[in-house]
């Protein structure tokens, strides 16, 4: 029943058809607003669903348009005239009830829907991306058992979930361990005598510890000094550029506060913060550049 109904509703397929060209694809997309010719192409009934997307869909359907005379007489299959008559008409109401990655999870969701929310309407299960007959009660006569590929995908999904949980647990454990090590090292730097595992140091060991500590602090100071020099050199260039622009156009100094107030007001910055920023930036760039030059930057 299902196969015949799908073929009657969707038409024949041709799996060997080549894909649409770029122009044909554009024309097909614009079918509702354009009239460019393009070949009608269907390669398969099943859409390719990404591995991370749900594979199954739950929905309910309520028929509101009566069947034709042939269907009313007891025929199991839907006739072609009934299908044509219903095209373009509202003949029922469907409600998507949820999605799931596996049949087991779909069954769990369906049981919860029936037990907790709706014990009136039939909850049906279908494959995402595959045609499925709309029936108001019961299930379709032809059922498709999960293929080996689907079973493998379900197993891979479950295994991937377990791996993700294990990786998350390892990350949390590693992060906790790192925090403990950092806290212990910070405490030891402040007071080396608080190490519970430390034995009584000799004068030589104490000297070596202080020597290494001094060396590390000296290297950190050198690196910080280099960064400070780089910042001050960049500041001097910016100050010189500001001085040159003010000399070329004195109105820049007058219009600068108004522009800053308008811009920060649009950004939602309070007037108090804006005025504090303007006060902070009201220094003389020429004097600042001269002082930096005197300092050797």
UniProtKB/Swiss-Prot annotation:
Pfam families reported for this sequence: DUF5832 (PF19150)
Superkingdom field: Viruses
Record's protein name: Uncharacterized protein 012L
Listed InterPro entries: DUF5832
Species assigned in the record: Frog virus 3 (isolate Goorha) (FV-3)
């Amino acid at each position: 029943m299902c196969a015949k109904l799908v073929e009657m509703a969707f038409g024949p397929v041709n799996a060997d058809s080549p894909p649409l060209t770029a122009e044909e694809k554009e024309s097909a997309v614009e079918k509702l607003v354009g009239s460019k010719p393009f070949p009608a192409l269907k390669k398969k009934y099943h859409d390719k669903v990404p591995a991370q997307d749900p594979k199954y869909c739950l929905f309910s359907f309520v028929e509101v348009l009566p069947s034709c005379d042939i269907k009313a007489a007891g025929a199991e299959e839907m006739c072609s005239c009934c299908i044509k008559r219903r095209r373009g008409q509202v003949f029922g109401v469907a409600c998507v009830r949820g999605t799931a990655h596996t049949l087991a999870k779909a069954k769990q969701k369906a049981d919860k829907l029936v037990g907790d929310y709706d014990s009136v309407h039939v909850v049906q299960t279908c494959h995402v991306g595959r045609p499925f007959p709309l029936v108001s009660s019961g299930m379709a006569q032809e059922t498709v058992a999960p293929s080996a590929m689907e079973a493998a995908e379900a197993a891979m999904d479950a295994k991937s979930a377990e791996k993700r949980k294990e990786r998350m647990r390892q990350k949390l454990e590693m992060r906790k361990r790192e925090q403990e090590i950092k806290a212990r090292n910070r405490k030891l730097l402040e007071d080396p005598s608080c190490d519970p595992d430390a034995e009584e140091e000799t004068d030589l060991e104490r000297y070596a510890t202080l020597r290494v500590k001094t060396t590390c602090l000296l290297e950190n100071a050198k690196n910080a000094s280099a960064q400070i020099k780089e910042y001050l050199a960049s500041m001097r260039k910016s100050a010189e550029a500001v001085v040159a622009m003010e000399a070329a156009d004195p109105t820049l100094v007058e219009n600068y506060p108004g522009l800053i107030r308008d811009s920060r007001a649009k950004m939602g910055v309070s007037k108090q913060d804006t005025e504090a920023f303007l006060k902070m930036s009201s220094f003389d760039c020429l004097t600042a550049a001269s002082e930096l030059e005197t300092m050797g930057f």
